[in-house]
Each structure stands twice: as C-alpha cells, then as structure tokens.
Amino acid sequence: MSFNPLNNLYDSLQNVINDNQNDITKFVEGNNSAGTRVRKAMQAVKSLAQEVRVEVQEQKNKKF
C-alpha cells in the first residue's frame, strides 16, 4: 500500500479526539480548566477536518 497523506490526517484527527476524552469528563464534572482544553482541542479538530476535506477533494480531482 502506498503512502497516503489522508491516512495521517485522519489518524491525527482521531488522536486529538481520543486524547481529550478525559478532559470532557472533567469538564462535565465541573472543572472549567478542562473546558478550556476541550475548546482548544475542538479548534484543532476543526482545522484537521478542513485539511481532510481538502485532501479528499484533491485526491478526487486527480482521479478524473
């Protein structure tokens, strides 16, 4: 299987989400600092999601 940057982007996206599970729980339990970390992580998710969208579009356009 050849290298595909989409795999790395998707793995990064999953890692950001998985790494912040504890902070989400802490925020629900009342830790406001954890909420700040969650918001920061969600900005990273937004950015990575956009990169995934762009890469998918680029790969789709290369096929046609």
Q: Where on the chain are the PLM-derived regions?
A:
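Short, surface-exposed loop/turn segments at secondary-structure junctions
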Residues: 28-36, 63
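Short, charged, amphipathic alpha-helical segments
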Residues: 35-43
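A charge-rich, low-complexity, intrinsically flexible signal that marks solvent-exposed coils, linkers
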Residues: 10, 34, 54-57, 61
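Short acidic DE-rich linear segments
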Residues: 1, 61-64
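Metal-centered catalytic cores of metalloenzymes
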Residues: 3, 11-14, 38, 49, ...
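N-terminal acidic leader/helix
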Residues: 1-23
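A structural signal for well-ordered alpha-helices, especially hydrophobic packing surfaces
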Residues: 17, 21-24, 46-49, 53-56
